[in-house]
């Protein structure tokens, strides 16, 4: 185990590990590189790309989620302004929201958009296209509707496939743990 970078304290745990039949693996950072990038932005309703990046990065800068960090990196590459955010709130399993200037903006997943009545066929199609290609999505919305859908890609590590095959060969069934929807996963 130590040759693989694992520290397991106590022989009992090593002995018990040989009885494993299932293992849960987190996707981000375990099976993927854990450094998602913005692969595309679908602008909706005539939204301005730089303004969308500014709003999304302003919210993202308040959050430690890897997708937020990717949006902040993209905004910095495009020299979009990161603005102060007031009343920032993390919405577990949904996204984040806060007040920027005089308006409220949110970064939300599709379920959260549906829950708030903000989704549309166009928004759902953007999310579905991303998930069909194995990518994640997050939408930027204001009080009037969805401004953009960010498509995020996180590269699979080079040794992931062989590692999963080795687990299966040992009779261990790997399970994927992720916040993504099933198709993206």
Protein language model features and the residues they cover:
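Juxtamembrane helix-loop transition segments at the membrane interface in multi-pass membrane proteins
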Residues: 1-11
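Cytosolic catalytic headpiece
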Residues: 9-185
């Amino acid at each position: 185990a130590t040759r693989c970078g694992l520290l397991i304290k106590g022989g009992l745990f090593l002995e018990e590990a040989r009885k494993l039949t299932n293992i849960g693996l987190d996707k981000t950072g375990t099976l993927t590189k854990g450094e998602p990038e913005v692969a595309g932005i679908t602008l909706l309703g005539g939204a301005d790309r730089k303004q969308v990046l500014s709003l999304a990065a302003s919210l993202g800068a308040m959050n430690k989620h890897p997708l937020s960090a990717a949006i902040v990196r993209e905004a910095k590459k495009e020299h979009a302004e990161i603005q102060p955010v007031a009343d920032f709130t993390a919405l577990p399993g949904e996204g984040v929201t806060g007040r920027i200037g005089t308006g409220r903006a949110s970064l939300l997943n599709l379920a959260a958009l549906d829950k708030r009545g903000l989704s549309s066929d166009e928004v759902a199609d953007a999310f579905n296209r991303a998930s069909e290609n194995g990518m994640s999505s997050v939408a930027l919305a204001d009080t009037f509707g969805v401004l953009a859908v960010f498509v995020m890609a996180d590269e699979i590590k080079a040794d992931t496939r062989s590692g999963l095959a080795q687990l299966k060969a040992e009779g261990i069934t790997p399970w994927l743990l992720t916040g993504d929807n099933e198709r993206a996963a």
